[in-house]
């Protein structure tokens, strides 16, 4: 029997791009999407430096074990907050990492003046959908459309 004990140390906003962050996205993004490559160092730098995005990372036993991107932007009807690209390393799943990332994002959106936080999640991501519902997210009666360029 293998016992995995994890200690979530903290969730933080990435302030700079270093080898650790680049390497973390190199192993995390393939666990989220097989159709999109991990962001390059330059793309990560653009994300971290953008006033419209917060790159959150969760550390477990000192190692980056999860990430979430919080996109915030103002439109005529108010400040919008969107949670995007939530990914937790397979070895750390089921230990509260995703919950910690989402709670941090919700609180940060609230602190910055948003009144709602939106996200999308594929139906096949059953564990993630249960987490979102447990945290208080509710399905909206809306359609999501995509135009591919």
Question: How would you label these PLM feature ranges?
Answer:
Residues 1-19:
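Conserved N-terminal entry element of GNAT/NAT acetyltransferase domains
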Residues 16-46:
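Conserved GNAT-fold acetyl-CoA-binding loop/helix
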Residues 46-57, 77, 82:
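A short helix-loop-beta-strand connector motif used in the catalytic cores of GNAT acetyltransferases and
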Residues 57, 63-72, 82, 87:
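Conserved beta-strand in the GNAT
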Residues 58, 92, 96-104:
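Conserved acetyl-CoA pyrophosphate-binding loop and the N-cap/start of the following alpha-helix
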Residues 73-83, 93, 140:
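A conserved beta-turn-beta hairpin within the catalytic core of GNAT-like acetyltransferases
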Residues 89-91, 95, 123-124:
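Active-site acidic-Proline motif in GNAT/NAT acetyltransferases
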Residues 99, 103, 111, 123-141, ...:
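Conserved active-site alpha-helix within GNAT-family acetyltransferase domains
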């Amino acid at each position: 029997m293998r016992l995995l004990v994890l200690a979530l140390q903290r969730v933080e906003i990435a302030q700079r791009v270093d080898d650790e962050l680049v390497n973390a996205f190199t192993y995390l993004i393939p666990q989220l999407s097989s159709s999109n490559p991990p962001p390059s160092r330059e793309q990560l730098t653009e994300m971290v430096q953008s006033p419209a995005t917060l790159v959150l990372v969760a550390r477990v036993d000192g190692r980056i074990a999860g990430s979430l991107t919080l996109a915030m932007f103002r439109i005529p009807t108010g400040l919008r907050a969107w949670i995007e690209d939530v990914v937790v390393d397979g070895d750390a799943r089921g230990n509260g990492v995703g919950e910690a990332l989402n709670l941090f994002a919700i609180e940060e959106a609230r602190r910055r003046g948003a009144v709602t936080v939106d996200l999308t999640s594929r139906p096949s991501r059953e564990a993630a959908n249960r987490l979102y519902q447990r945290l208080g997210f509710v399905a909206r009666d809306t359609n999501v459309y995509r135009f591919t360029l």
